[in-house]
Amino acid sequence: MLDEADPSEDCDRTRGLVDLDRLGQWMDAEGLPGSGEEVQATFVTGGASNELFEIQRGEHRWALRRPPRMVPEGRNETMLREYRILRALADSNVPHPAVRAVCAEPSVLGATFYLMDFVDGWSPISESHWPEPFDSDLGARRGLAFELVDAIARLSRVDWKARGLEGLGRPDGFHDRQVDRW
């Protein structure tokens, strides 16, 4: 959780990956709210896969997702694909953060990134203990599991073709191809 992070590490990660002046200029060009307000960034989580920052400008909060400092091959395209999928889920009943803007121009932050609404929460994968009531109440954990299943079921009902998601891969024979990867 944020309050457990080392503040010096947060500052180093933010300084090296989020140029606040360039980000603010880009946000202004995109017409995002808070023009003229100071942009602040706080490291949330990341590592080898992708980095996540909380971005604040005035009363507005977003999450910025970007590749790590050393951008692996293909990662910029992955960011664009993630943005495309989240954007396609707009107005669906699938729980997801609304995306606000994407930047594929490396001169802004050195890699492709996107901004989405900030959602307060926690990751059961990256936390050593879960917040209450999930840490001690098995009924709450059970309810959380059912919410996860419900979200996956909702996602499975999305008409991905009608939402413009063709071209993300080969849907035919997907499961059969996975067996060879095991």
Where are these regions (language model features)?
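Juxta-kinase regulatory segment immediately upstream of eukaryotic protein kinase catalytic domains
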Residues: 2-34
